[in-house]
Each structure stands twice: as structure tokens, then as C-alpha cells.
């Protein structure tokens, strides 16, 4: 066992900190208290140091956008079809991506990673530990959300292949969800009569956890109109949704606050690369938290 001794402990549950020990066994926290070092094989002196739980990155592409990999290292954007809910982050994840080491060094111990924002519907995000060399052993949960995207990226990737406007992008998402709804209705009717089970549809099957509220839509949104469209569609189909990036969220902070929707805000370092970044503001997260 390992004991982290006399550190200032932040629990992430309470604002108050306290000085104490953390006893660890087989990589898991066994006990938090004082004078626990007598039970340990190894003692790490933490006097004067701040001790935090591992950080969780709720939205990234680590393991699928491989460090210094160039085009061949980019596994997170599928550009042959704008609707690919059947894709899984687990199948593209590279456990040897150097980004994982960088994440660990920054204190990140768990990540939600998955498809990028080229597609209207991109596939499932998964949760991974950042430690390990075998993908299946690193998986915390295989499906945590279904990626969808609004705004410039789907337009740019598919402008000559079916999506040239925000209106079309929204319509494509609606069409996929409605098709899956009809499929789900048939599946439910087949519970009492297996002969009525619909012909297998891989895309519809992948969207069933969304419609059943087992996982949320994970919506890539920057502009205020895209944020509003994402929430509109979630309401229409009665599904859960989280908002990612939310660059112009401060413009409708009151409405977003009333929505109760969870948001992952940022990043803030690329304000000049796209039109939809023009209102980027590091203060947005603080404004929304109020």
C-alpha cells in the first residue's frame, strides 16, 4: 500500500480542504484520514503540497487524434458519410498516443474521447483511463454519449456531399433520429411478437440508447444559433443533450441557465481560425456558472 502523507487534500465534493493522509491499495483510494502511514509499504511526503483527485476531461479526441501523427494519425473524423452513429471511439483508440502521457502529467486520469465534428452525427464517445497499454483494459464505459455537430464543420466537410447549410445539417440530424424512433417503435412492438422485429439497421440500433435516454447527445456548438438549434432538436425528440464548446453561450446565458443542460466550455486559444470563434471569451464559463 501507498500513503500520501500530510498533504492539503481537496475532495472535489466540498469546498473546504483539510490536511491528512490518503491510503492507496492496488491503484484505488482505500482510506482518507490521519496517521495512516503505519499501514503503508511506501510513504509519499506531501507537506506543503496540494492533493487533488484525478481530473476528468469531459470532451476531447485524445487517442483518436494521435500526437504528431499527421493525416494518418487522425482517426476521429469519418468523412464518407455525414451520419455515422454506428462508429465507436473504442475501435479507433490508440493506447500509445503520446497525448495520454501528457494528460497524465497534467493530472488527468480519465477522459471522454470520441469522434470529431465533421459529421452531423459522428458516433459514440467512450470513457477511458489514461493509464494502460491495452484499450479494453482502459475502458471505463464503452458508450457515454452520441456525438453530433452543428455549424461550420459539417458544412465544410460535406458541402459537396449533402450539407451546405445549417438548415440541412439540422434536417439530417432530425431525419436520422426520426428513422430511429420508427425503428424503436417496431422493436418495442416486437417484444410480444418476435416475428415483428424490424430488419436489422446498424445506424438505428446505435441511436436507440439516445432515444431511451441511456446516453445523451453530445453536441458540438459554437454560435448562439447552433446552440439554440441543438436544444430545439433535443426537446423535439425528448432526448438528453450536453453542449460542447459553447463559444457564444454568454449571449444567451440566462436561457442556458434555465435549461439545466450541462456544458463543456472552451477551448479559448484559436479565436482567429473560424468565423464562429469570433466571440470567444475566457469569461464565458464563469458567466454561465452564475
Descriptions of predicted regions:
Residues 6, 59-63, 220:
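Histidine-centered divalent metal-coordination motifs
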Residues 7, 22, 27, 48, ...:
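Divalent metal-coordination and catalytic microenvironments
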Residues 9-52:
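Histidine-rich, glycine-flanked metal-binding segment
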Residues 67-68, 74-80, 84-87, 216, ...:
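His/Asp/Glu-enriched, well-ordered alpha-helical/loop segment
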Residues 99, 104-241:
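Polyanionic/metal-chelating signatures
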Residues 248-258:
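Active-site-adjacent beta->alpha loops and helix N-cap segments on the catalytic face
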Residues 198-200, 219-223, 244-247, 273-281:
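A general structural motif
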Residues 49-115:
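Metal-associated gating/positioning segment near the N- to mid-region
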Amino acid at each position: 500500500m501507498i500513503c500520501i502523507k500530510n498533504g492539503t487534500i481537496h475532495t472535489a465534493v466540498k469546498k473546504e480542504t483539510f490536511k491528512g493522509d490518503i491510503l492507496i491499495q492496488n491503484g484505488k483510494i482505500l482510506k482518507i484520514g490521519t496517521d495512516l502511514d503505519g499501514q503503508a509499504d511506501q510513504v509519499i511526503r506531501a507537506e506543503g503540497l496540494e492533493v487533488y483527485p484525478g481530473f476528468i476531461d469531459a470532451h476531447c479526441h485524445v487517442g483518436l487524434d494521435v500526437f504528431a501523427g499527421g493525416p494518418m494519425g487522425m482517426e476521429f473524423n469519418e468523412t464518407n458519410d455525414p451520419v455515422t452513429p454506428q462508429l465507436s471511439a473504442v475501435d479507433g483508440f490508440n493506447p500509445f498516443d503520446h497525448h495520454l502521457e501528457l494528460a497524465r502529467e497534467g493530472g488527468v486520469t480519465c477522459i471522454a474521447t470520441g469522434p470529431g465534428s465533421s459529421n452531423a452525427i459522428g458516433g459514440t464517445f467512450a470513457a477511458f483511463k489514461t493509464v494502460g497499454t491495452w484499450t479494453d483494459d482502459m475502458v471505463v464505459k464503452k458508450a457515454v454519449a452520441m456525438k453530433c455537430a452543428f455549424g461550420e464543420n459539417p458544412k465544410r466537410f460535406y458541402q459537396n456531399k449533402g450539407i451546405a447549410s445549417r438548415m440541412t445539417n439540422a434536417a439530417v440530424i432530425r431525419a436520422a433520429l426520426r428513422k430511429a424512433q420508427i425503428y424503436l417503435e417496431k422493436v418495442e412492438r416486437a417484444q410480444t411478437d418476435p416475428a415483428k422485429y424490424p430488419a436489422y439497421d446498424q445506424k438505428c440500433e446505435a441511436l436507440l440508447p439516445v432515444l431511451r435516454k441511456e446516453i445523451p447527445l453530445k453536441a458540438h456548438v459554437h454560435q448562439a444559433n447552433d446552440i439554440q438549434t441543438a436544444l430545439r432538436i433535443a426537446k423535439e425528440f425528448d432526448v438528453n443533450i450536453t453542449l460542447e464548446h459553447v463559444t457564444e453561450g454568454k449571449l444567451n446565458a440566462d436561457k442556458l441557465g434555465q435549461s439545466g443542460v450541462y456544458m463543456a466550455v472552451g477551448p479559448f486559444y484559436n479565436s482567429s481560425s473560424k468565423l464562429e470563434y469570433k466571440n470567444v471569451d475566457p469569461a464565458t464559463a464563469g458567466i454561465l456558472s452564475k
